[in-house]
Amino acid sequence: MRVVLQRSKEASVTVDGEIVGQIPFGLTLLVGITHEDTEKDATYIAEKIANLRIFEDESGKMNHSVLDVEGQVLSISQFTLYGDCRKGRRPNFMDAAKPDYAERLYDFFNEEVRKQGLHVETGKFGAMMDVSLINDGPVTLIVESK
């Protein structure tokens, strides 16, 4: 499992002109799932993200987690994170999980994030989405389970 995590001042996701998910501040997650991922990977990533100390304390050091600052999470499914661009000019997405499997694991992942005590908004799995955010910092990390 691969997640691109962005610390966000605000974020939203729109499908067909309608906002389907929105947070005031917290973390925006682009979530990629490969066919080898399991529920164990999803739980590991959910716990890691909830507890990563990437929000600043009073002295400007990254000492607080999204839980500590009472932030929220906007989770967006993103199969293109497993695009392989090493050969040719068109990405190969063979490492991305099949949609049925990926959607089930993506839903499980979001529930695991909620179990950590976080409010989670989502996009619409498999839809063409417009994602808007104000990246705070910018702080952008890649979190992987393997």
Curated annotation (Swiss-Prot):
Pfam families given in the database record: Tyr_Deacylase
SUPFAM superfamilies: DTD-like
GO cellular component labels: cytoplasm
Keywords: Cytoplasm, Hydrolase, RNA-binding, tRNA-binding
EC numbers: 3.1.1.96
InterPro entries xref list: Daa-tRNA_deacyls_DTD, DTD-like_sf
Class of enzymatic activity (EC top level): hydrolase
Quaternary structure note: Homodimer.
NCBIfam families hit by this protein: D-aminoacyl-tRNA deacylase
Listed name of the protein: D-aminoacyl-tRNA deacylase
Organism: Bacillus cereus (strain AH187)
Higher taxonomy: Bacteria, Bacillati, Bacillota, Bacilli, Bacillales
